[in-house]
Amino acid sequence: MAKKVQAYIKLQVAAGKANPSPPVGPALGQHGVNIMEFCKAFNAETQDIEPGLPTPVVITVYSDRSFTFITKTPPAAVLLKKAAGIKSGSGVPNKTKVGTVTREQLEEIAKTKEPDLTASDLDAAVRTIAGSARSMGLNVEGL
């Protein structure tokens, strides 16, 4: 018999740096999950991702207080800011441009994000990421 799902918890946690402090501790604690067990499992799973990169995770909590989790790829905005070397996007993206990204950088980000994107091929994924870049106030070269 399948376990009964009690809750889904969606968090963004720095890769390899999960610890019991907020936001992880309170979110898991209110559902009775063993926080240290999650932190150790999450850190082990994200050790191959660049440390400190925010990584979305969906935690499924079952009625017997056990859990499973699925890690997603880092948000496109974070990867774009890293590629462009900027701290934050533009407040008025259509008027003020804050940086530039090339098609090669977009392709690299699209390959990283491919498991989470609904794009049918790499070119469609690149166009999706380029749209995110433009809405952040980045110039897109070579597209």
UniProtKB/Swiss-Prot annotation:
Biological process per Gene Ontology, one example term: translation
GO molecular function terms attached to this record: large ribosomal subunit rRNA binding; structural constituent of ribosome
One term under GO cellular component: cytosolic large ribosomal subunit
Keyword Oxidoreductase appears in the UniProt entry: no
Classification via PROSITE patterns: RIBOSOMAL_L11
Stored SMART domains: RL11 (SM00649)
Gene3D superfamilies named among the record's database cross-references: Ribosomal protein L11, C-terminal domain, Ribosomal protein L11/L12, N-terminal domain
Keyword Methyltransferase assigned: no
SUPFAM superfamilies: Ribosomal L11/L12e N-terminal domain, Ribosomal protein L11, C-terminal domain
Domain of life: Bacteria
Family: Belongs to the universal ribosomal protein uL11 family.
Task of the protein: Forms part of the ribosomal stalk which helps the ribosome interact with GTP-bound translation factors.
UniProt subunit comment: Part of the ribosomal stalk of the 50S ribosomal subunit. Interacts with L10 and the large rRNA to form the base of the stalk. L10 forms an elongated spine to which L12 dimers bind in a sequential fashion forming a multimeric L10(L12)X complex.
Protein's UniProt name: Large ribosomal subunit protein uL11
Lineage: Bacteria, Pseudomonadati, Pseudomonadota, Gammaproteobacteria, Oceanospirillales
